[in-house]
């Protein structure tokens, strides 16, 4: 695994324009009914793990006060170090993060999974504490259920890596910086755990389905 700058993609556009892997197409075709195979690209794991372009719904981080304090880099055992290196490598490869020189930075913590593995997570509570809250309206569940009245056929669409499909607003990336013993990095996509992330995602999906809301589509996140 190479964490040096020479291993980064030369341009974000190059990463976005990579062609679909034939093996991935074959895998998707086996599980997608023939009726929907004209839309194979929307089922693609490869495309879901590429950096999305900026859009009007990019996640904006507005601070109410000063920058959160810089987090402490804790000592790690070998298992934690291996997991951290894998996380950094995976997200650099996808184009979801890049090196940062931000004057702030959150530490990385590890949570044990049921299978004994480790889940790495950025401790961003101090950033959330100084972020202005987005009061985007979220429809109550009873209103969503009322739309179903009289319907008998339902489809559920679940988005792969949902939050990571949304970009951080240009210029706000440095606020998402996390510090490690290898380097500091910042997110180009909206990571899980950010305050206002649910509101930003609801706004994005509502914008996509604007003309179909409460006609054929309801949007709900849990």
Q: Which role does the model predict for each range below?
A:
Residues 1-22:
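An acidic, Ser/Thr-enriched, charge-mixed low-complexity segment/SLiM signal
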Residues 1-3, 32, 205:
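Generic low-polarity alpha-helical segments
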Residues 41-70, 111-119, 134-136, 142, ...:
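Reverse-transcriptase-like RNA-dependent polymerase core
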Residues 5-6, 25-33, 168, 191:
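Alpha-helical interaction segments
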Residues 15-138, 215-222:
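Reverse-transcribing Pol proteins
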């Amino acid at each position: 695994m190479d964490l040096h700058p020479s291993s980064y993609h030369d341009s974000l556009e190059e990463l976005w324009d990579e062609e679909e892997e034939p093996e991935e197409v074959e895998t998707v075709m086996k599980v997608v009914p023939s009726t929907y195979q004209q839309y194979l690209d929307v089922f693609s794991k490869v495309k879901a793990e590429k950096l999305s372009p900026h859009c009007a719904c990019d996640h904006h981080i507005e601070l109410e006060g000063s920058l959160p304090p810089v987090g402490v880099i804790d000592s790690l055992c070998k298992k934690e170090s291996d997991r951290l290196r894998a996380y950094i490598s995976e997200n650099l490869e996808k184009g979801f993060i890049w090196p940062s020189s931000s004057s702030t930075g959150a530490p990385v913590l590890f949570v044990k999974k049921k299978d004994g593995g480790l889940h790495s997570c950025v401790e961003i509570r101090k950033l959330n504490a100084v972020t202005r809250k987005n009061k985007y309206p979220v429809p109550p569940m009873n209103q969503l259920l009322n739309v179903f009245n009289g319907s008998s056929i339902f489809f559920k669409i679940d988005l792969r890596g949902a939050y990571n499909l949304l970009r951080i607003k240009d210029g706000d990336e440095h606020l998402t910086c996390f510090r490690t013993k290898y380097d500091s990095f910042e997110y180009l996509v909206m990571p899980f755990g950010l305050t206002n992330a649910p509101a930003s995602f609801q706004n994005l999906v509502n914008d996509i389905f604007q003309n179909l809301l409460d006609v054929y589509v309801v949007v709900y996140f849990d």
